[in-house]
Amino acid sequence: MAKPKSPSRRELLTNGVKAAGVTCLAGLALTAYVESASKAEAKALRPPGALPEDDFLAACVRCGLCVRACPYDTLRLAEMGEEAPLGTPFFVARETPCFMCTDVPCAKACPTGALDRDIPNIRKADMGVAVLVGHESCLNYKGITCSICHRVCPIRDEAITLEVQTIKGRRMVIPTVHSDKCTGCGTCEKHCVLGQAAIRVLPRELGLGGRGRNPAGRAV
């Protein structure tokens, strides 16, 4: 059997340069991705007590302690391609909402102050705001009374109320979000009976309209 031919020094150098080039390009791509993600419009829901997004990103060290402290596995660290900058904590309301622990263990676990450890009351948390985005799909707008989002709301009759409205000559019971009371916990979105939730929780700066009104029509 012929002895395998050993690669020449030139081949070794060439392969080494190619590998270094690939590694360099991958590193540049990752750096560009992280930079672009950090500058992207905030779309992720942050843990309770989070600082304003820019301050939060500056203070968060991506340690994951808040994720480990959450007893309901609500929080997770963002992976590449997700809606939050890489390694930062966020949650997806449709999957697992915030259960609004009164002792706020996630915030207390934060070592840098990216989450306010002295948040006085979980009801003062500002994770986002619920918005009725699917008027055409919401059962109430079809004349079918559905009160799921109202019934599951942990601040029922304050954050979400049911109001009788006359729409196109028909009296309907419509869920109405009061943005000054909503914490953005996401329980309403989680339990919406539709395949694609008609009510969604968005970061407050996205969920509120330009004139200080919730897109559903409620004043801030």
Swiss-Prot record:
[4Fe-4S] cluster 4 binds at C153, C182, C185, C188. It comes from the Bacteria. [4Fe-4S] cluster 1 binds at C60, C63, C66, C110. [4Fe-4S] cluster 2 binds at C70, C98, C101, C106. GO terms for molecular function: 4 iron, 4 sulfur cluster binding; metal ion binding. Signal peptide: none annotated. Pathway: One-carbon metabolism; methylamine degradation. Pfam families: Fer4_7. Residues 50-80, 88-120, 173-204 form the 4Fe-4S ferredoxin-type domain. Disulfide bonds: none annotated. Keywords: 4Fe-4S, Electron transport, Iron, Iron-sulfur, Metal-binding, Repeat, Transport. [4Fe-4S] cluster 3 binds at C138, C146, C149, C192. Involved in electron transfer. This is Methylamine utilization ferredoxin-type protein MauM. It comes from Methylorubrum extorquens (strain ATCC 14718 / DSM 1338 / JCM 2805 / NCIMB 9133 / AM1). The lineage of its organism: Bacteria, Pseudomonadati, Pseudomonadota, Alphaproteobacteria, Hyphomicrobiales. The gene is mauM.
